[in-house]
Amino acid sequence: MKSHIQSLLEQTIESFKQQGILPADFEARIQVDRTKDKSHGDLATNLAMMLTKVAGKNPRELAQLIIDTLPASAFVAKVEIAGPGFINFFINDSALADQLQNAVNDEHLGIKLPTPQTVVVDYSSPNLAKEMHVGHLRSTIIGDSVVRALEFLGHKVIRQNHVGDWGTQFGMLLAYMEELRAKNGEQAHLELSDLETFYRAAKLRFDESAEFATRARQLVVELQSGDEYCNKLWREFNDISLSHCHEVYARLGVSLTRADVHGESAYNADLEQVVKDLDAQGLLTESNGAKVVFQEAFRNKEGEALPVIIQKADGGYLYATSDLAAMRYRSNVLKADRVLYFVDLRQALHFQQVFSLAKLAKFVREDMSLEHLGFGTMNGEDGRPFKTRSGGVVKLVDLLEEANVRALELVRSKNPDMDEETLAEIARVVGISAVKYADLSKNRTSDYIFSFEQMLSFEGNTAPYLLYAYTRVAGIFKRVTGLDLSQAKIVLEHEKEKDLGNKLAQFGEILNRVVDKGQPHVLCAYLYELAGAFSSFYEACPVLAADNDEQKNSRLLLSQLTARTLQKGLNLLGIETLERM
């Protein structure tokens, strides 16, 4: 509905250009918002006030001219001017009912699909050789929810798990294995059963022994040079580490597969060429032995140019080098229209610099959109980054296990007579959903406080509340036998029916915001509001005890659409629904 009003206003703008009211090359930014007070209509725009200067007319006069020029629409019952020049649109109830009727038998719930694009999404991307920790949660689940929404809206999505599968950490592991082999022979391989412990021991040696650190760096060079033994062990380290990652993904219900892994090592062959191409364009400068690029737009507080380091003095490459190679691959090979990077906000400057350099060096097409969708940190209840009591990093698998244990206690307390198998399954879904939803419901760019108590509450904007809301709606249909709604029609008479219908009709515009801005929290807020709108409708409008069959069937269709929208919305967040709680 919102996009329909925007389309009417766009046509009006074009008409103004043809009449000479607006310059032919004028580009208007049309904003249409939902009203909070329904006495002011359903939708409103401040377009008249935005155009008043360029059109040379006062806002109310221009607002009336816009109304007079608007194309006729069956969706609009009336249009009014309010205040200094706001234009309020009142939606036709019968047209809204028709829109909802069309959604009933549509797999996309009546959503008009946008022009499909090829979208590369870079998310999760943990460093290998050690276990995933809570710091990997946000990129993994925010990226996955946006991916799901993009696919639902018809876009071609290419997942890219840009894992850190190269570099110094592998030199440490190789050097440590070398030492163990000297002591224990082939038995040294048994140590790899716990790669995390193996990594910590290697890191300790690296920090304590300069000789060990030198050997580790030498082995990185041998690995990069294609040494057969080093590469065999490297593949083994990666395989063990990736197996752990995918166990976590499976538990989280994340859609990443082994086929989506395209790590740093995938770009090794192109790194030297990246340096040569930058040099050939005269972009490289030598600074303290390193090869760097300075861009005028990036300076520190003292006004000094900030470098993008492409190659270190010792010949090693950095993140910027592999990121540039990846961007070129995503532009030229994957043919991406958009590339989305779900990476910590603290990397904002890095991405601004490499995005700018990629365009400057023509490594990517000018029309390809590069977007860093950064996120804040997950903090403990003390407001500091989430840690164990001893100050260590919290493993993601341990966090999920604790969520499961707490959810089991909660579900058992509410269902003391339920069998253990059913309890365990409900607790699994509730625990994982609570962790994911608590994160996804927060603005992506904000830090947030992690609290099991809040996320497992059945009150407020939480996963347990929404899972229960879904079972409540779906439960209506368990009380009906021989139901046939094939000839039923949606009729919006009661005010609460209209409120619910209006909320259902917003699903498409909400999903477009999710994919345009990478903000799943707007979907969470919408689902919470939808559950509230249904609750108000259900209290005011008897469904199974309606006055007549026509009214009952209409309300059953509204209930069915609500259940489908809640389920689809939760699924797009990567959350399973339950048939009973």
Curated annotation (Swiss-Prot):
Catalytic activity: tRNA(Arg) + L-arginine + ATP = L-arginyl-tRNA(Arg) + AMP + diphosphate
Disulfide bonds: none
SMART domains named among the record's database cross-references: Arg_tRNA_synt_N (SM01016), DALR_1 (SM00836)
Keywords: Aminoacyl-tRNA synthetase, ATP-binding, Cytoplasm, Ligase, Nucleotide-binding, Protein biosynthesis
Gene Ontology CC annotations of this record: cytoplasm
EC numbers on record: 6.1.1.19
Compartments reported by the entry: Cytoplasm
Broad EC category: ligase
MF GO annotations: arginine-tRNA ligase activity; ATP binding
Family designation: Belongs to the class-I aminoacyl-tRNA synthetase family.
Listed HAMAP family: Arg_tRNA_synth
Protein name (record): Arginine--tRNA ligase
Gene: argS
